[in-house]
Amino acid sequence: MLGAALAFAVAVVASLGAEPAAARAQAGEGDKGERLMNASCQGCHGVRVIQVQAKNAEEWSKTIDAEIARGAKVAKEDIPVLVDYLVDHQGPLPDGRGKAIVLNVCTMCHDLSRIRRGRRSPEEWEETLNAMLNEGAPLGDDQFPIVHAYLSRNFGVE
């Protein structure tokens, strides 16, 4: 029984964001943005630096301009594609208690689009967080209720 529940929880979490990503991949949009990020950004630093910033389009544009000034190789016509990709996958999250934990813990395995699209009831967020703990997420006992409240408040069922 526990094995079936765990398998279900893992399947639910794995399905978060699968359909939109597949649709983008068919259109080739997400692929190009990801390729640009891998080639242009990760040549100097790892993806972790990107994952914890949660910037909007204007902020990502400024960051890219600053990185180009430091020597990053991004063609002018590729900047909007890269910005769109970063906003979609590493874009802004609502402010509030728990945001920093989500950025530092959840993004170790998930991009922010997956978190933003994961509309769930408080009970479903609790199940999801417990499933992630079972998978090895480094979420402390004191952090669990904070993250649970943040996700339930900001990414609840609409």
Predicted segment positions?
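Extracytoplasmic/secreted proteins, especially bacterial periplasmic and envelope-associated proteins
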Residues: 32, 36, 59-62, 81, ...
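The canonical Cys-X-X-Cys-His
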Residues: 38-47, 82, 103-113, 147
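N-terminal, post-signal-peptide region of Sec/Tat-exported proteins
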Residues: 48-78
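Bacterial N-terminal signal peptides
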Residues: 3-17
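Short microdomains enriched in Cys/His and/or Lys/Arg
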Residues: 61-72, 126-139
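Electrostatic cytochrome c docking/interface patches
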Residues: 18-36, 66, 76-101, 135-137, ...
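Short Cys/His-rich "knuckle" micro-motifs
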Residues: 51-54, 93-94, 116-119
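Short, amphipathic C-terminal "tail helix"
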Residues: 147-156
